[in-house]
A protein has these predicted regions:
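Extracellular beta-propeller repeat domains
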Residues: 31-340
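Bacterial N-terminal signal peptides
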Residues: 13-24
Length: 340
């Protein structure tokens, strides 16, 4: 496929997605008519969180942010920035590893589910890598032991890996269960509420990170790319689970960590920035080099906000973007949306 054909394919793909979202009611033309123009403005909504990676918008409209260091989920009021503890008592980050514990959180209805990683016995821990259902402020039920599944089902595509239980990064609700990315074993898993686990997509060393699901079964996924996280390896791809067709949507931003659709029907992503020269796989990017980017119809990115310090996850509430950083901040970005 030549460059012109590829650009046309991407443009048609975006237009079809947008039309389908409008038809389904996820985006309404009246909402689009009220979108703001202008340069995005950034402020710190909340700070002082510890070990922050994944986040989501809960059924009450608040932000829920994982704190791996503390083994808990924080609730952040998107208007005032007030922080309260939603759930505590989850496995904490192992000091010998430096990352892990709770890494993402989602809601199915009003029930929260937490993705936990790098806490198993192979790394010196005594907990289970997998999905935990929140039954109360400090009560949980493990619904899926993903670490054991990974031990029993190692990757079949050859690439170097050294954590056999995997590094679980992000999850999204999918058909009554979940899709989970493994940024170390380079695959996407399907997990049912009953704990059944299967591999729905397997890749070579592309480092899958954040993902979003639209129209029930179309997955948009961010790729961080292997060390040294070159810009051309930072990509958004799209696929249907269990399909061999994976389409590149956009590329050109280093170490992508999350992807979301905005209210304007455009696709946005977080770039953590260039990797640190000589750093080990899994290391964060260079400080203050992250960016909020928007995917264009020609397969490139437009950089909207730069110099973000180690962003990890992205959510939209109305016309506002909320960015969680590895340093424990929640940033609020106004005036993001533009027509195309």
């Amino acid at each position: 496929m030549n460059s012109r054909q590829r650009q046309l394919r991407i443009k048609v793909f975006f237009v079809l997605i947008l039309a389908a979202l409008i038809t389904a009611g996820s985006i309404r033309p009246a909402n689009c008519a009220s979108l703001k123009f202008g340069s995005p403005s950034v402020s710190v909504l909340a700070s002082g969180l510890q070990g922050t990676l994944g986040s989501t918008v809960g059924p009450d409209g608040a932000l829920y942010v994982v704190e791996g260091t503390l083994g808990q989920i924080a609730r952040v009021d998107p208007r005032t920035g007030k922080i309260s503890t939603f759930a505590s008592g989850l496995p904490q980050t192992l000091s010998s590893v430096g990352i892990g514990g709770p890494t993402d959180v989602v809601f199915v209805g009003r029930t929260a589910y937490v993705l936990v990683t790098l806490v198993s016995s192979d790394l010196g821990g005594n907990s289970i890598d997998g999905i935990y259902r929140v039954d109360g402020p400090n009560q949980f039920t493990i619904i899926a032991d993903i670490g054991q599944f990974n031990l029993n089902n190692p990757p079949t595509i050859p690439f170097p890996f050294f954590v056999d239980t995997g590094v679980l990064y992000a999850m999204q609700p999918y058909r009554g269960g979940f899709l989970v990315t493994d940024g170390h074993l380079n695959r996407v898993l399907s997990v049912t509420l009953g704990g059944k686990i299967s591999v729905v997509e397997a890749f070579d060393d592309i480092v899958p990170t954040g993902l979003t699901v639209v129209l029930g079964d179309i997955v948009f996924m961010a790729e961080a790319g292997p060390v040294p996280h070159l810009p051309q390896n930072g990509k958004i791809v799209a696929f249907r689970p269990n399909s061999s067709n994976v389409a590149e949507v956009a590329s050109g931003a280093s170490l992508l960590v999350d992807v979301k659709f905005g209210l304007d029907g455009r696709l946005y992503a977080l770039s953590q920035g260039p990797g640190v020269p000589g750093a080990a796989p899994g290391s964060p990017a260079q400080p203050n080099s992250g960016a909020l980017v928007r995917a264009n119809l020609d397969g490139t990115f437009t950089f909207l906000v730069d110099n973000i310090n180690l962003p990890t996850s992205l959510n939209f509430i109305g016309n506002t973007a909320y960015i969680v950083t590895l340093t424990g901040d929640v940033l609020k970005v106004n005036d993001v949306f533009h027509f195309f």
